[in-house]
């Protein structure tokens, strides 16, 4: 039962033991005999740093446990004293103990290796190599190396203490994990592993027992006993090392260990988390190796399609067919599913409850009503152990089909023209919405109406508003007419207009808490709140426009807002300050204010896995593409439609749509126009 419990460090108890030990004098050993230990093979992996098996070694006495290690340990080089606590795990060469620095009560996981166990040169060389590799690593998701020292009896390696032990312990208690948990842990493993590979270090022993969990439920990749430098293919070592169930075909065939071999092990880890057993586990090792060489394993029907596809890609027999770490994190398994920002410690032994808090639940309740309202849905989206209402089922369905978009941000303070803060919960549509035309343009797009002006109490109010619908339909009709009739061309037309209009230069998705914020080119800041209300702070920073519904505008001073709007004005100012301080403009278009034009405010915004779409009250339509920061803006001026394209270098070009209709454009622009139209057409599906 001890293995099933979440182990939490209790400083008071350890300190008391240390005081008792100090009372007996430094170096005093406990004479109390230990109870017999079970065979090592019967224990799950526990150590913070597994050690390769040692060659047989014989003592005159204490042949199994070795000489007793002192309770108080002194570092000869610094004079620091440490108190040795309980055993955390054991490997071939060493045992891992809880160890407390008596000067500051900091707790470490100490790997203690008797000199007698590494007496042969090649054994000592392995320990030195592990220390050399591990001590240079510094990453949030890699077990931190702190210090090492030696005395006459032992070598001591002080590592980051992970109070909640390893993923092996969690899976032993839980049997299987839910998909959201697997995404949560895998993201962190991929992050740590990507760092290792960037340092040209192969782990070579990825498995549940080598992923350690700290007090905050953060995962750390540990155990560098088998780690090695990445070598060119022709110079790779042909040795077979690692844990049998996780070995890749190329390692078994002595073709060398590369980054792809770590990816294979990651596939085994994902499979084990979801199903509770490794993919190639059989009754004997010979059969296991045969299955691995043939990449032969069963894929239960209980797994959802994205999980099956990702596992299958990582367990490709040919190393070259396996995905990169970047490919893994961009896979539909991550993009289409809910990933919690954090996990409760209760997840170590209990299935988590991912029910939403009230504010977020209300937002999803509205979205679920809009998308699923009035439909009899007999499908089950919740595991049988969860008793939920139909409302919760719909909400879960939205969450389950979630898409989170990741944007690579520049390291500087002023990162990009747009920042995406993936909310704790995001919603997306899976499936393939139909477009009412024989020649559907582009592929179906997975997305969700993330923000719409006005109340969202029903689908008709939320998605079918006649004014909003007519704005969208007009833009879609014009864009579609251009795309379907313009000729093929290899380049962008030479005509370039010099004109001014308003467009979104910066945006922030903070819908996990408040709503969606944006800044226009005239420096107006707007927020479309989660409750459907819209608020704008004008460029003078003194005047606020508030829209509860389309066309219903209230105007008041920012410093003297009506009581019911004070909190929203505070949020509006927060968005304004954040974008001013942290984001830079997304293009080179001039910033001109035309007081004759109506005030722009956001009607609707949507996000897919590739782009953000924004539709405004005057028909201005903007689509920002995440991967290269290109943008398309369509607006009308003097009864004529204009299209502006901002390229990867933030250089803008503006055309009349009639010019594109006559001359055509490059495939680079056309593809983006098609995708933008598809988003617009599917906005209500």
UniProtKB/Swiss-Prot annotation:
Q: What is known of its domains?
A: The POLO box domains act as phosphopeptide-binding module that recognizes and binds serine-[phosphothreonine/phosphoserine]-(proline/X) motifs. PLK2 recognizes and binds docking proteins that are already phosphorylated on these motifs, and then phosphorylates them.
A GO cellular-component term linked to this record: centriole
Q: Which InterPro entries match?
A: Kinase-like_dom_sf, PLK2_STKc, POLO_box_1, POLO_box_2, POLO_box_dom, POLO_box_dom_sf, Prot_kinase_dom, Protein_kinase_ATP_BS
* Domain annotation POLO box: ranges: 503-581, 601-685
Name of the protein: Serine/threonine-protein kinase PLK2
| Residue numbers of Phosphothreonine PTMs | 239
Give the source species: Homo sapiens
Alphabetical GO biological process terms: DNA damage response, signal transduction by p53 class mediator; G1/S transition of mitotic cell cycle; long-term synaptic depression; long-term synaptic potentiation; memory; mitotic spindle organization; negative regulation of angiogenesis; negative regulation of apoptotic process
List all disulphide bridges recorded for this chain: none
Q: Which family does it belong to?
A: Belongs to the protein kinase superfamily. Ser/Thr protein kinase family. CDC5/Polo subfamily.
